[in-house]
Amino acid sequence: MAETIVMIHGMWGGSWYWGNYKKFFEGKGYRCIIPTLRFHDMDPKAVPNPALGATSLLDYAGDLEEEIRRLDSQAIIMGHSMGGLLAQILGSRGLAKALVLLTPASPGGINALKPSVIKSFASVLSGYGFWKKPNRQTFNEAVYSMLRLLPLEEQREIYDRFVYESGRAASELGFWFLDAKGASKVDEKKVSCPVLVIAGSKDNITPASVVRKVADKYGAVSTYKEFPNHAHWVIGEPDWQEIADYVSVWLNQALTGSGH
């Protein structure tokens, strides 16, 4: 039976942005399942559901857990950006055969508020009550934080597909130290499967220095790989295939038990 990969998108995104990876990994014989997070299946130009603003990371994780538990076998869970944090939460619930974290957001306990990260969220953070409202980056922020290595035309195309994100989820991520519920916390002792953590040296929103700490958190089960010519949009930047190839080789080794 083919191995299953569940691919979890990040902030402002949707299942659409996994197109390259879906085609690549289906070509390797994997079955790919690409959920869309709650309230993200919307017209980018439409007014977002007001309930989005108060949606927690744990709401997203709960929805994903339900979907994953319906599968007939344990899946590989792959997440990009905020999806990488959701993958870690799901991994700590014993739901993953392996975790692949692509430029992941960091769990509570790791300080991610570097100057470039704050700049990435400047317009969001400047609005009063941002922690309970739907939010969206400006085009310039999206380019600076995520899309800077793409051609202008592609930057526009991707930005125009971005939807609103939950202010609560963003706050649980960035300001975990103010969150009494600890929504972004992950108990690393409960993650026993192999973990691959990918960083881009040019990433502004999940800087490599922070992503390395994510890998360190999982100790012996984790593998850290940093790509010097990549930033945040590793699923679609020029030469994205080199990262997908690396992931594919690592998965082969991790799943056959020949080391990771």
In which residue ranges do the predicted regions lie?
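Active-site glycine-rich loops that stabilize anionic/oxyanionic intermediates
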Residues: 10-13, 201
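Conserved alpha/beta-hydrolase
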Residues: 26-48
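Conserved acidic catalytic loop of the alpha/beta-hydrolase fold
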Residues: 59-75
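Gly/Ala-rich beta-loop-alpha elbow adjacent to hydrolase catalytic centers
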Residues: 79-83, 87
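Flexible "cap/lid" loop of the alpha/beta hydrolase fold
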Residues: 95-132, 169-177
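Short beta-strand/loop motif that positions the catalytic acidic residue
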Residues: 191, 197-199, 203
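Conserved alpha/beta-hydrolase "acid-adjacent" motif
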Residues: 204-210
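Catalytic active-site module of serine/aspartate enzymes centered on a nucleophile-bearing elbow/loop
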Residues: 221-260
